[in-house]
Amino acid sequence: MSRPSRRKLAYGGVAVATLAISCGTITPSSAAGQVLWTPSTSKGASSFASVQCASGNFKVVNDAAKGKVWRAYQAAGQERCETLSPDLKNGDTFYLGWSSKVDIKDANSRYVFQLKCDPSTDTANHPIEIDATDGRIRLQEWDTQHVSHTLWTAPTANGQWHSYALKIRLGRTDGTIDFWFDGKKQTFTTGSGTFKGTTWDGNRNYLKWGSYHPSSGDATNTFTSPVMATTLEAATAGS
């Protein structure tokens, strides 16, 4: 499958408060923005605060299109293979950028990205998530009553690389989400390019990449090192 063309993205600077980051790399600021966090494939899994995966199923691999990337392999019957990092701070605004391809061996969806909150009960659980099946990718927001709101969908297929970028302002009821897919700003099902709602809940929030939801078939999420940054340009430079 051909690699999607890379496009130069328009961006705007934004003031970003200090994030509770414990792992990964931080780079100095520049006119193009500051990278706040990104894991290193050279450093390996220790770049993340934790990895929730069966032994040997999360690793760095070489991809013909992207070079060194992360591979999260969720074997049939296993609940998840996910990374966890970094922790977030309510009220902050930041950009995220990465590329991913999936290989899902059944018809059930897997979460390939989560903005997760603790505790899981009596909260949104995962205020923002992207889930995939073989044929469809979807972005959803979950409110404080744990009710899902589909914001966007697009067709996809196993083995296709796609790029993702999010601008997130964290808030329990007044958070915002903007989204870019394969370099293009997306319009949500609401008709707007910015969604306002729940992007934070509970007492701890953090980011997860990988594959989640137990099922009868294997699933693999291969992804580039995610970048958290103060601008869209900085977050997507390596995607």
Describe each model-derived feature in a short phrase.
Residues 1-16:
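N-terminal export and membrane-targeting signals
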